């Protein structure tokens, strides 16, 4: 086998990171994802075949170059909101990704099965992506399947698999191409039949999903069930305005003259962005809220049958005998309260309905592992509004008072496919995404977040109305097409009709079944590998003692 020098491996690690970065939305070319992991696979194979010449954790060290470059190039924009948060997210996420590669090398070394060795890494990787969704350091922005977010014609089959199907697709093609390239590097003779088999496999794996997806995209017809929606984009600067303007000034921006000219009695829903109402509202005292009162008066005057959905910072007092959770904050010597990032559902007459954001941003909306580090919660990064560990909703709330059942997904929650599908399983026929992306300024961050909503539309076959404080606000149909959008960092109001849907997709019904399956297989692989490792260590020790 041709042995590459260590400097060549470093170059390969850099190449893999560059290819992953250049594939990423919004300006990237996603086809590059199909070759982006080949350099990394070559590195892993080189280390595996020449393990005696490499230091411990060599797989981790080389792959860390790849993932640090990729994470930095695609999520650098976090720096605009928090320097510490950016460094933490980039460094730790790169370490976790590299750890996956290192664990795969450990398993390969113990299992000593060539065929199994090749497929261990994608199995572990998909398991990592799946498990990374549901812990305190969750950061799923760079799930590989997200790479196709701006090219939804290729991935209409996400309605069956979700983004983990895209991750699997990328890994399979990379591995098949790696077989060919590795045979060249290894100077192995491949029979014509074997080479043709690999080429056919690559063609089948790439072409069949692509053709089916394009056909599905071209032939998908939405059942007519139009819902009239207005999106408000007040463009409040989160650094200088949103948390400093008076309630009256915020309401004047939100319910602008343009909004008043566009909204009439035919509008079904009016949607405002995340955290736009920062009045310090206690949830048992909404009747005293100036913001809620003004919205109700606005509805009565302009559109009495409409329903108003808006983000807000709200609070709830704990009852005297109520157990205190990790989000509890001291109000005074005897009373406790908790804060929420809330979606308010308001009509012209009844009390507002609330949904509390449940996928919280680590370090901003919750301190990771708060049960262990409650004393240092005051270090939570302050981005305005409510900070520290926030309270959550245990249920995926569906609002039934309007013409169709709807749900509001708050900001970061829209990145989680299975999470969003739970609202649909609970009855939502439309999804509203309310967000405030102004923290990241005019970078790739808000654009990536915008196109990720297109993936949720395909997965659930739900039309999406997205209200973003500074943009991009938009309407997305059930195929994932953006049918109308605003410009970034402008004050605007747009109105359109999108179709509600009652059908449940395979993905909505079964969720991330690929990730669950891979996690079970990974657990088995790691367990067997540990047993083999310990058995070998015992035998080695016995052999040494016998001598």
Language-model regions, residue ranges each:
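Membrane-embedded alpha-helical bundles of multi-pass enzymes
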Residues: 1-217, 442, 453, 483, ...
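Active-site catalytic loop in hydrolytic enzyme cores
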Residues: 78-84, 131-163, 328-417
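CN hydrolase (nitrilase-like) catalytic-core segments centered on the catalytic cysteine
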Residues: 93-96, 122, 269, 276-277, ...
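A conserved mid-to-late transmembrane alpha helix and its immediate loop/hinge
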Residues: 160-165, 315-316, 412, 460, ...
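Soluble catalytic regions of membrane-associated enzymes that act on cell-envelope
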Residues: 213-363, 398-402, 408, 412
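Short, highly charged, low-complexity non-transmembrane loops/tails of multi-pass membrane proteins
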Residues: 544-547
């Amino acid at each position: 086998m041709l042995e590459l020098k260590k400097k060549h491996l470093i170059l390969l690690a850099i190449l893999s990171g560059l290819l992953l970065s250049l594939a990423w939305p919004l300006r990237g070319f996603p086809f590059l994802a199909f070759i982006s992991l080949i350099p990394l696979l070559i590195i892993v194979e080189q280390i595996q075949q020449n393990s005696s010449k490499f230091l411990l954790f060599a797989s981790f060290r080389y792959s860390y170059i790849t993932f640090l470059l990729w994470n930095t190039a695609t999520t650098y924009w976090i720096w605009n909101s928090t320097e510490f948060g950016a460094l933490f997210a980039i460094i730790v996420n790169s370490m976790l990704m590299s750890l996956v590669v290192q664990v795969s090398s450990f398993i390969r070394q113990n299992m000593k099965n060539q065929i199994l060795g090749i497929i261990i890494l994608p199995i572990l990787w998909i398991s990592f992506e799946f498990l990374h969704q549901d812990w305190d350091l969750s950061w799923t922005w760079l799930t590989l399947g997200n790479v196709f977010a701006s090219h939804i014609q290729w991935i209409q089959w996400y309605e069956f698999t979700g983004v983990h199907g895209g991750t699997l697709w990328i890994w399979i093609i990379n591995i098949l191409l790696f077989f060919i390239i590795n045979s060249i590097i290894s100077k192995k003779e491949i029979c014509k039949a074997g080479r043709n088999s690999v080429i056919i496999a690559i063609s089948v794996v790439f072409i069949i999903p692509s053709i089916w997806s394009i056909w599905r995209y071209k032939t998908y017809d939405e059942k007519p069930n139009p819902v009239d929606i207005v999106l408000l984009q007040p463009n409040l600067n989160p650094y200088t305005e949103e948390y400093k303007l008076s309630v009256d000034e915020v309401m004047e921006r939100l319910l602008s003259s343009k909004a008043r000219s566009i909204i009439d009695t035919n509008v079904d829903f009016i949607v405002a962005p995340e955290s736009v109402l920062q009045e310090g509202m206690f949830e048992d005292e909404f009747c005293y809220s100036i913001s809620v009162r003004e919205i109700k008066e606005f509805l009565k005057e302009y559109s009495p049958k409409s329903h108003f959905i808006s983000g807000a910072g709200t609070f709830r007092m704990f009852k005297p005998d109520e157990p205190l959770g990790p989000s509890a904050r001291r109000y005074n010597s005897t009373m406790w309260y908790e804060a929420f990032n809330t979606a308010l559902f308001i009509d012209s007459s009844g009390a507002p309905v609330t949904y509390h954001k449940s996928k919280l941003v680590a370090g901003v909306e919750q301190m990771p592992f708060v049960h262990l580090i409650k004393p240092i919660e005051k270090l939570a990064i302050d981005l305005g509004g409510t900070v520290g560990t926030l309270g959550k909703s245990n249920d995926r709330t569906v609002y039934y008072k309007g013409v169709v059942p709807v749900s509001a997904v708050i900001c970061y929650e829209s990145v989680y496919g299975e999470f969003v599908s739970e609202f649909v399983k609970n009855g939502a026929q439309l999804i509203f995404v309310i967000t405030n992306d102004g923290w990241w300024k005019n970078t790739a961050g808000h654009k990536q977040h915008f196109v990720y909503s297109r993936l949720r539309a395909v997965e659930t076959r739900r039309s999406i109305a997205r209200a973003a404080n500074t943009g991009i606000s938009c309407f997305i149909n059930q195929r994932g097409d953006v049918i109308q959008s605003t410009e970034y960092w402008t004050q605007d109001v747009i109105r359109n009709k999108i179709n509600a849907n009652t059908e449940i997709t395979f993905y909505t019904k079964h969720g991330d079944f690929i990730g669950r399956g891979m996690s079970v297989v990974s657990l088995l692989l790691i367990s067997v590998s540990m047993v083999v490792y310990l058995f070998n260590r015992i035998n080695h020790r016995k052999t040494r003692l016998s001598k």
